[in-house]
């Protein structure tokens, strides 16, 4: 079995099963002082064959009554690993017996996440705070020793598919872009491959959707609708052909009827704006 980078795995790590829910504590350290930059809580679903797959990651203001315990545990992990400078991404399972470490990496979280969206929710990004730690260590604590708080709420939804097939169209781009909290997304994996895999893990998710709103209720209403579409109307997100025997054709989109792609000029511009929004792009950017 190979890694996600195509390199052979030569070892195995066994971990005990931790029953609970998973959270993330992202930090930036400077001279051994740790500053929380953002907190996340993962949601997961169970597939028909019993696999646990990521459903989404929500940016949260705190972890409720276990906040202090989890943050103290995360800081203790950083101290034990001697992470005294720069970014760290710590994943923790909150169990009935207390926090359990899943992983801690001396890195920022989510290189593919929209930094613009994160900045709108926090007023900064973990990468920006990291630069401050390296470039201005003497003034870092004075500048960042303030309570962690959100300006807006955010949730990154990892779409899931129970079907596998060649991709005919992605009506979900236009549909989801119309939701109040949807600010962007990433469909590039499906667009490049021309197919949708049956989702069994994070890497077989067909797309990511980025949601952000001042009202947390609106955020949850929109993601609830997306989950309903995944379960009851996947064809409204991805139109697929079940004939997988034809194999992958890199120019699959050229074989589709024109009426699936070409529209009158007066309709084309709004459609383009919708697609740019859904993909997190703006006019003139490739």
Where in the sequence are the language-model features?
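A short, structured beta-strand-centered segment in the mid-to-C-terminal lobe
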Residues: 59-67
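Peripheral (often C-terminal) accessory segments that flank ATP-dependent C-N-forming ligase machineries
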Residues: 131-286
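Conserved ATP-binding module of the ATP-grasp superfamily
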Residues: 1-19, 50-57, 75-80, 240
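Short, well-ordered beta-strand elements within core beta-sheets of diverse protein domains
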Residues: 16, 59, 119, 205-214
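Active-site "cap" helix and flanking loop/linker of ATP-utilizing ligase/carboxylase catalytic domains
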Residues: 68-90, 96, 105-168
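A short, glycine/Asx- and small/polar-enriched loop/turn
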Residues: 94-100, 200-204
């Amino acid at each position: 079995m190979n890694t996600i980078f195509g390199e052979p795995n030569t070892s195995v790590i066994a971990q005990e099963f931790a029953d609970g829910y998973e959270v993330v504590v992202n930090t930036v350290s400077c001279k051994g002082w740790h500053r929380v930059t953002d907190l996340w809580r993962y949601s997961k679903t169970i597939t028909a064959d019993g696999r646990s797959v990521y459903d989404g990651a929500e940016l949260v203001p705190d972890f409720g009554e276990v906040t202090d315990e989890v943050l103290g545990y995360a800081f203790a992990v950083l101290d034990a690993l001697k992470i005294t400078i720069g970014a760290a991404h710590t994943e923790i399972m909150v169990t009935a017996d207390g926090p359990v470490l899943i992983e801690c990496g001396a890195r920022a979280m989510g290189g593919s996440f929209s930094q613009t969206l994160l900045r709108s929710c926090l007023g900064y990004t973990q990468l920006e705070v990291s630069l401050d730690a390296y470039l201005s260590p003497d003034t870092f604590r004075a500048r960042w020793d303030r309570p962690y708080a959100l300006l807006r709420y955010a949730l990154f939804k990892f779409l899931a598919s129970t079907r596998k097939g060649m991709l005919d169209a992605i009506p979900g781009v236009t549909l989801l872009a119309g939701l109040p909290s949807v600010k962007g997304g990433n469909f590039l994996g499906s667009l490049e491959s021309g197919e949708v895999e049956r989702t069994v893990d994070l890497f077989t998710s067909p797309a990511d959707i980025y949601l952000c709103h001042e009202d947390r209720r609106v955020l949850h209403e929109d993601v609830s609708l997306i989950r309903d579409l995944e379960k009851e109307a996947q064809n409204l997100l991805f139109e697929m052909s079940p004939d997988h025997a034809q194999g992958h054709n890199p120019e699959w989109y050229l074989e589709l009827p024109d009426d699936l792609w070409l529209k009158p000029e007066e309709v084309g511009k709004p459609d383009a704006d919708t697609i740019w929004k859904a993909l997190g792009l703006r006019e003139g950017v490739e």
